């Protein structure tokens, strides 16, 4: 399966049991900031935004004082999993980022999708990629 297939079929799909509810945007991005695949709605990000995200995975708490920025949007960093998952909130939506061996899996959501549903979709694919050595 192509990387775009993972984004289209495993991230931008209907949430299990909630037909028509899906993430707003999603992407798989290499640790170096290169986009492997993304939805048409994924924001154009700046290199320094990706650097900040990678720094937070290596130094958990790095983004907490300033917030997580992606495509010029600021998210308040909320409880994640140090070195593995970063979660952010903005209004009725938010973001989940799962780190794998070689990539970052991004999911962005708005209501009616819940934070837990976004976490489930993003982390399930991230865990699968980790199992595959990616």
Curated annotation (Swiss-Prot):
Pfam families: Profilin. One of its GO terms (molecular function) is actin monomer binding. Phosphorylated by MAP kinases. InterPro entries: PFN, PFN_euk, PFN_sf, Profilin_CS. It is found in: Cytoplasm, Cytoskeleton. Signal peptide: none annotated. Disulfide bonds join 13-118. Keywords: Actin-binding, Allergen, Cytoplasm, Cytoskeleton, Disulfide bond, Phosphoprotein. GO terms for cellular component: cell cortex; cytoskeleton. SMART domains: PROF. It comes from the Eukaryota. The modification Phosphothreonine is found at residue 114. A motif (Involved in PIP2 interaction) lies at residues 84-100. Occurs in many kinds of cells as a complex with monomeric actin in a 1:1 ratio. Binds to actin and affects the structure of the cytoskeleton. At high concentrations, profilin prevents the polymerization of actin, whereas it enhances it at low concentrations. Belongs to the profilin family. The variability of the residues taking part of IgE-binding epitopes might be responsible of the difference in cross-reactivity among olive pollen cultivars, and between distantly related pollen species, leading to a variable range of allergy reactions among atopic patients. This is Profilin-3. The lineage of its organism: Eukaryota, Viridiplantae, Streptophyta, Embryophyta, Tracheophyta.
